[in-house]
C-alpha cells in the first residue's frame, strides 16, 4: 500500500528542513498568507535536494491572520490570485531545474472551496489554465475535488492527521471545540483508520467514509517533527510506503 505524506512549508517554521526528510510532498507558501521570494527559493532548493514533490500553496490575501479569515471574493479574483501565486512558485521551481507537481490551497481558501462550487471552479480553472498536468489536492469528497475532476485534472484526496472531522466529512472549524487534535496517540490512530480502513470518527462519534490519498501534517504544529517521525515508523511497520 502507498500513501503520500505532505506538509505545508515556507511558513516561517524552523523545522522545515527536517520535515523535508520525512514527507514525500511539500506545499510551499506563495506569499499571500506567509513566506516571500526568499523562503520560496529556500524551500524549493531543500525539496529538490531531498527528492520531495513540490506544490504551490496559494491562499487568500491575508498575512495578518495567516490565511484563516473568511473572504467573499469574486471567483474571477480568486482565479487571478491563484494563477499569480502558482506562477510565482513555478518560476522559482523552473529556475532551479525542478518541476512543480501539484497545487493545494491553504487555510480558509481551502475550506471555503471544499463547500463552494463557484470558488472551487475558479481554483480548478486556474490550475488547469496554468498547467493541466498539475495535480489538484483538496479535502476528500469535497467540491474542490469534484471541480478538479470536471476540468479533467488529476486530483488527490487529502485527509488530516491532526484535525477533527464533522459527520459530513468536513473539518471542524478552528473556532469550535475539537478542531485540533493535540494528543499524539489519537492523531496516529485517526490517521491509520483513514489510510487503512477508509473511515474517520467524527467529533459527534459518527463514523464516516473517507478516501485517503495524501495525509497532511501541519508544519506549523508544535510537535510536527516528532509526530512525522512517529507516523513514518507506524507506516513502515504496516508495510505502507510513503511515496508522492
Swiss-Prot record:
User: Known SUPFAM superfamilies for this protein?
Assistant: Glycoside hydrolase/deacetylase (SSF88713)
Q: According to the UniProt record, which cysteines are disulfide-bonded?
A: none
Q: What is its EC number?
A: 3.5.2.9
Q: Does the keyword Oxidoreductase apply?
A: no
The reaction(s) catalysed by this protein are: 5-oxo-L-proline + ATP + 2 H2O = L-glutamate + ADP + phosphate + H(+)
> Which GO molecular function annotation, any one, does this entry have?
ATP binding
Single Gene Ontology BP term? carbohydrate metabolic process
| Top EC group | hydrolase
Q: Which UniProt keywords apply?
A: ATP-binding, Hydrolase, Nucleotide-binding
Record's CDD domains?
A: LamB_YcsF_YbgL_like
Protein family per UniProt:
Belongs to the LamB/PxpA family.
Q: What does this protein do?
A: Catalyzes the cleavage of 5-oxoproline to form L-glutamate coupled to the hydrolysis of ATP to ADP and inorganic phosphate.
Q: How does it assemble?
A: Forms a complex composed of PxpA, PxpB and PxpC.
* Record PANTHER family: 5-OXOPROLINASE SUBUNIT A (PTHR30292:SF0), UNCHARACTERIZED PROTEIN YBGL-RELATED (PTHR30292)
**In its UniProt entry, what is this protein called?**
5-oxoprolinase subunit A
Q: Which gene encodes it?
A: pxpA
